[in-house]
Amino acid sequence: MEKPSREAFEGNNKLLIGIVLSVITFWLFAQSLVNVVPILEDSFNTDIGTVNIAVSITALFSGMFVVGAGGLADKYGRIKLTNIGIILNILGSLLIIISNIPLLLIIGRLIQGLSAACIMPATLSIIKSYYIGKDRQRALSYWSIGSWGGSGVCSFFGGAVATLLGWRWIFILSIIISLIALFLIKGTPETKSKSISLNKFDIKGLVLLVIMLLTLNILITKGSELGVTSLLFITLLAIAIGSFSLFIVLEKRATNPLIDFKLFKNKAYTGATASNFLLNGVAGTLIVANTFVQRGLGYSSLQAGSLSITYLVMVLIMIRVGEKLLQTLGCKKPMLIGTGVLIVGECLISLTFLPEILYVICCIIGYLFFGLGLGIYATPSTDTAIANAPLEKVGVAAGIYKMASALGGAFGVALSGAVYAIVSNMTNIYTGAMIALWLNAGMGILSFVIILLLVPKQNDTQL
């Protein structure tokens, strides 16, 4: 069993602030580039394709390595991995701002992805170790504010900073926040698993996972350009299927696997993780809806972003409400309520056939429900995932949960964008946007069914 010395140390507000600040280095600062793509094209004198690679590579690398980092946190120390992640963010930020060389921009963003992979599971594990009962639920609420809230604010934040101070100040501020986080976390006793032997790291599993995810990403983002009957597409599909199959076989046989599939024997953990993947996938809503109102209704990017202000406000407000609902109703009901409300919001945003004024009203109300639903869902889902993981495996469990977040968002955006482009070319942008938004609503419905079937009414397995 793990011995985190709770008698000697209990989580406090100083540590919690440090944790939240470390979390927003990714969800707020690193993600802010989604709103400064044209500026980066001019600053680095490069094409939009290169900039898009730089923007997307952070979340992709975070998703690919977060599980492995969770395992390292369990073995070598969660405080240590958190500090390493913060230092990596500082290094990545410096590489981004010191020159106008596109290669350094991409390398810096890649390093920021590795930073997020270290920080996310390690900080969740620290909360699991040093916060108990209602204190843990409160800590998870603030952690969720840093992640879900940060992702909601990042677009406006990036645009505001880039306009008022210049885009490099996004990362200068990120470095300052990182240094403050290091100071606040300093002095916290180390916590790690005592029951996991320090075996050789599962390199084979990691390599196969990276190959599989990179191949899937290429298939989704470039599939329509390649053509589903092309030799390259078929080859990539075979590589993806083959690497996935081999990964499953090797991981089940490994004595110290990268992903411990035994965790999924717990239905509550499986339900929380699968629904988390799908509800992060509905991030495609923002891409599709914003693109539609700009191209279809002639709105500026600022006007398009203004439609989602209700989402930003509600997700921040409702995260703490979700915590209170968790304490009074348990995990399942808030997760179902949140997902159901989100589906209603998604359906309202998809009504692209309405006259402009009516559609704008539906969008504003829809985004309100969208943020309300995600805010209610966030804390109960996170609590369900880590509360149902064995203490000695909590780093790996948290890593898998956050991998679901990162990859759900990445693939949700890719799928939504692909469907929007394909259907728009076949029909028109109104129909393309509607079908793509229905895809997101479908992911919400599937998430609702998973929660209904897998998450128990009472979490008897909570530790």
UniProtKB/Swiss-Prot annotation:
Subcellular location field:
Cell membrane
Gene3D superfamilies from the entry? MFS general substrate transporter like domains, Multidrug resistance protein D
A GO CC term?
A: plasma membrane
Q: Which UniProt keywords apply?
A: Antibiotic resistance, Cell membrane, Membrane, Transmembrane, Transmembrane helix, Transport
What function is annotated for this protein?
Multidrug efflux pump that acts independently of NorA and is one of the factors that confers resistance against diverse quinolones and chemical compounds.
**What lineage does UniProt assign to this protein's organism?**
Bacteria, Bacillati, Bacillota, Bacilli, Bacillales
The biological processes this protein is annotated with in GO are: response to antibiotic
Alphabetically, the GO molecular function entries are: transmembrane transporter activity
Say which species the protein is native to.
Answer: Staphylococcus aureus (strain N315)
Task: Name it.
Answer: Quinolone resistance protein NorB
